[in-house]
Amino acid sequence: MSVMRTGIIAKKLGMTRLFREDGTHVPVTVLHMDDVRVVAARTKERDGYAAVQLGFGHAKTKNVTKPMKGHFAAAKVEPANRLVEFRVADDAVLEAGQVLSAAHFTVGQKVDVAGISKGKGFAGGMKRWNFRGLEASHGVSISHRSLGSTGNRQDPGKTFKNKKMAGHLGGERITTLNLEVAAIDEARNLIMIKGAVPGAKDGYVLVRDAVKTARPADAAYPAALKA
């Protein structure tokens, strides 16, 4: 059995906590799958690679362009608010119109979650890269939070590309690995992930099987679909 099955797209609702039977509690992030359905399938014979295109939510018809209206009409599905594509194995390609369930993942399973991190604006080296900063006294004037040397002297006499310096922080795609699925609410299409996931509230995240941990044997393959 191949390990490459589709992931899912979900909206981050926020954080809460779950209580266990022994009285302890665990912080969780609640993710909502809003009618996640297959919009298109990619096959090696036709497209050169195998993948599944998923749609999330529902878009207003007036906001959908004519080319995209034709794309959704060909799949016989309603226009989606978001589209995302996952590479899959040849035997894990799904048919257009199929709807994924929150039971796609199992409790205790490890997953990787990708999202757009919160934008922090322009940040200095200490906040952006955890630099130590300079001395608080002992001859240091006005440069307590500065970077220090960036280009040496005559040799090399320049600042190398990708040097860690002050600049824009956040607002980029971040993937957190090996997060644990704490609970599943299949009736309400909710997935609860232990701990924090990247991004702000109401942001979109991609959840897939962990690449560094084996998929549970009882996980649905190629996907958990709604009847």
UniProtKB/Swiss-Prot annotation:
Task: Mention one GO biological process in which this protein takes part, according to its record.
Answer: translation
Q: Which residues carry this modification: N5-methylglutamine?
A: Q154
PROSITE patterns this protein is in? RIBOSOMAL_L3
Q: Does the keyword rRNA-binding apply?
A: yes
Domain of life, source organism: Bacteria
PTM per Swiss-Prot/TrEMBL: Methylated by PrmB.
Q: Name one GO cellular component term.
A: cytosolic large ribosomal subunit
Question: What UniProt keywords are attached to this protein's entry?
Answer: Methylation, Ribonucleoprotein, Ribosomal protein, RNA-binding, rRNA-binding
Cite the InterPro entries for this sequence: Ribosomal_uL3 (IPR000597), Ribosomal_uL3_bac/org-type (IPR019927), Ribosomal_uL3_CS (IPR019926), Transl_B-barrel_sf (IPR009000)
An example of a GO molecular function for this protein is:
rRNA binding
Q: Does the keyword Membrane apply?
A: no
Assembly state and interactors?
Part of the 50S ribosomal subunit. Forms a cluster with proteins L14 and L19.
Recorded hits in HAMAP family, A to Z, give: Ribosomal_uL3_B (MF_01325_B)
Q: What does this protein do?
A: One of the primary rRNA binding proteins, it binds directly near the 3'-end of the 23S rRNA, where it nucleates assembly of the 50S subunit.
Q: Which family does it belong to?
A: Belongs to the universal ribosomal protein uL3 family.
Q: What protein name applies here? A: Large ribosomal subunit protein uL3
> Upper taxonomic classification of the species?
Bacteria, Pseudomonadati, Pseudomonadota, Alphaproteobacteria, Acetobacterales
